Amino acid sequence: MSGALRAFTIGLTAFLTVVDLFATQAILPALTVSYGVTPAAMGFAVNATTIGMALGGLLVALFGRSIDQRLGILLSLAVLAVPTALLATMPSLPVFTLLRIVQGLCMSTAFALTLAYLGEHASASDPASAFAAYITGNVASNLFGRLLAAGVVDHLGLAANFWVFAALNLGGAVLVWFTVERTPPMRQTDMSHGSPFASWLGHLANPALRAAFGVGFLILFAFIGTFTYVNFVLVRPPFAVDMMMLGVVYFVFLPSVITTPLAGRAVARFGTRPVLWASFAVAIAGLPLMLSTSLAALLLGLALVAVGTFFAQATATGFVGRAATIDRGAASGLYLASYFLGGLSGSAVLGQVFDRLGWTACVVGIGIALALGALLATRLIAAGHRADAASAFQIARPSRHGGTTS
């Protein structure tokens, strides 16, 4: 397989693995009307996938070394089609929430095992390009998944949307069947001899890793708060965009598809902390624009938030993989759990702020989260120059991430 085809296949696998994660955000207004609930309630239900994503990351960190990676990825994507299809029945809100959690569990397991597979089998000359392709596919799913969901709902309705995405899940399983080679369980070249829980305690005792986990929490907190509740702003006056246009709005992710693969080079040249500070500064610069009554200004603000948070995510995940000195899989599992719990918290907390105080207060909350992330970034100094010199995409080595999704 040529390098370009291999990169495309890796990116497409990432796309089909996490396309369900954020695509449903684009149809939040339609779901809110259909269920007759508040934006905060529907936002929490839709973003409940983050609970499953967090659990999946931890489970793979615990048991991933004994799992056949190809079989695990294949089954996760095939099973993912089941809760996705059941969502088409438009169940009660609690059941909807539970099905989203199951979706998250399946996605996270496939995501983590795929990254582990790449870490084990990417050649020594191109691991960064393999991880960059996977992360870029993840970013692309944020754009094209939302665009697809909005278009299907606009033309065929809510139920058809979930049937289409179930078909995509099965397509991902088929792709894995034909492109991922069978492998033995993960090698344990970088494992401590203690239990995974002992490794977790060791990681939590590391101030730099604790700070990195906090940075991840705050990144998705801000990202979810932005791209969940801005949908309700866009469908109301003065913008009043329709469902199809709401999907088109998410072309604001296109710059991120271009910039995110550059994170590794930026870290190698400038270091982790400066890159994180610059990333958070870019995201914060977009916040005032998100309060504008001009659609163009609002979209520019969203694009800046997307570029900043995706770049920060690539940088922070890379730091965790390099800074952990033992059991990097466990460190990555803890990071993923913190990252996705941040998304769930952002959905819940900023949803209540949006319902009670409005969009301006919600944006202020997003700004506070981003500022705290920049502050925590000052503590990412573990492993010195060695950690900063490596590519930001080395997170996935199991002998060292287990999602984002942002």
Language-model-detected regions and their locations in the chain:
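C-terminal transmembrane helical hairpin of 12-TM major facilitator-type secondary transporters
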Residues: 273-316
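Helix-loop-helix hairpin linking two adjacent transmembrane segments in secondary transporters
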Residues: 93, 124-126, 133-180
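Helix-to-loop junctions at the C-terminal end of transmembrane segments
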Residues: 57-68, 258-271, 354-355
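Conserved MFS/SLC helix-loop-helix module at the cytosolic interface between two early adjacent transmembrane helices
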Residues: 55-91
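Helix-breaking motifs and short loop linkers at transmembrane-helix boundaries and internal kinks
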Residues: 36, 68, 89-94, 123, ...
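Juxtamembrane intracellular "pre-TM" segments in multi-pass secondary transporters
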Residues: 181-213
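Cytoplasmic helix-loop-helix junction between adjacent transmembrane helices
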Residues: 99-138
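Paired small-residue
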Residues: 83, 94-103, 296-304
